[in-house]
Amino acid sequence: VSASHPIISVTGSSGAGTTAVTHTFQWIFRREGIRAQIVDGDSFHRFNRGEMQARIAEAAREGDDHLSHFGPENNLFAELEALFRGYGETGRGRVRKYLHNDEDAARHGQPAGTFTEWEEIPADTDLLFYEGLHGAVATDTVDVARHADLCIGVVPIINLEWIQKLHRDKVTRGYSTEAVVDTILRRMPDYVNYIVPQFSRTHVNFQRVPTVDTSNPFIARYIPSADESFVVIRFARPKGIDFPYLLSMIHNSFMSRPNIIVVPGGKMELAMQLIFTPMILKLMDARRRALGAPPRP
């Protein structure tokens, strides 16, 4: 944690909706003139797509049906913590990109499912923004969460998360339902041990809850819409959160606990704008003071 070089971390499982959250933050950064270094969590996988598929096949032949992208053996946890620590201390570090699809790959002139070369973060960034699977991960040897100034969890109820993953992987990646279900089953031990515990270390959690029947996510024809859901927003430290203001600004919102506000699904982006803009500006003001710069006009 560093006033001079703040870090915002958004963490969530595959299919949780972290990418949509990132788009909202990018909009805030543009509006406020903030230079953010965006870090894609997938770039800290240890193996590229082809290598990982080969490892999964080899593990299956040896009777291991639980090798996944969620656990420490297939990720660069130490390097991720080193990035967070180093950026907090100096505002610098090394990053790379993971090329998810053919469009990304074409821009970089290499195959999809591979990594770009490591590059140094420019010297003029205002903050680091991480979005991925492990933004609050902690093991016996690493603790990424402790380096983040603002840590956000995006965690739909699990049936909804599975519906979103099924639809994304089938529509955008061409997988069959059976292949996606196999992936969900294979990842379950690492999901329980490395993904779920992160949401107890976050500062704010967003949990989308559908109001339609999702009892069997594997036969769902549609992803429940925003209007068919609520978003449960939990604050780990509610002191300083202006709940009366949020309730007045977000129609049909209500509080279910002293540290939880519930908003209609269609108001999630508005809620994020109202909640995080003041937090980001506070981080930027602290950065200016630490650097001896004048305050915002």
Regions found by a protein language model. Give the residues of each.
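Post-Walker A alpha-helix
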Residues: 21-22
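Conserved lysine of the Walker
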Residues: 18
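Phosphate-binding P-loop
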Residues: 1-5
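Conserved nucleotide-sensing/catalytic segment adjacent to the nucleotide-binding pocket
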Residues: 34-40, 44-106
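Short hydrophobic/aromatic beta-strand immediately N-terminal to the Walker A/P-loop
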Residues: 7-9
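Residues at the beta-strand->loop junction immediately N-terminal to the Walker
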Residues: 11, 131
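C-terminal accessory "lid"/substrate-recognition subdomains
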Residues: 114-123, 127, 144, 158-297
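The conserved Walker
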Residues: 14
